[in-house]
Amino acid sequence: MTKLSRRQVAGGILAGSTALAMPSLAFGALPRVVVVGGGAGGATAARYIAKDSKGAVDVTLVEASKRYYTCFYSNLYLGGFRNYGSIGHNYYGLATNRGVNVVHEWATSVDAGKKVVNLGHGGQVSYDKLVLSPGISLKYDSIP
């Protein structure tokens, strides 16, 4: 009979609990991270999760728009020093350089119990970890 130390038992419990926390790991699949929102916060989160994991995490970015127009440098556009297109960015670099799966669709709801993001066309994207970065929404009618 093989003797196990307390440290080995604790390590086994930790490994087993990791599989429970991220069910895809129990079946040998990569852990899945879904980022909702492709603005400055969401795109940056997706980029660095993919970059820092070195391919060990399956990263999906859900963003309805094909281009993001940044607030950064917008004053240069407003001042006439840059054209409007220069402050727009697509998601091609995230997909090709970082391996991020980009889904151009509205995220309509999240089912935290099932760990899925429901999409506007009726599809779903499952996740182990979720990052919500939907940006802001202004209520123009609330300004007197």
PLM regions: where:
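A conserved short coil-to-beta-strand element within the FAD-binding core of flavoproteins
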Residues: E105-K114
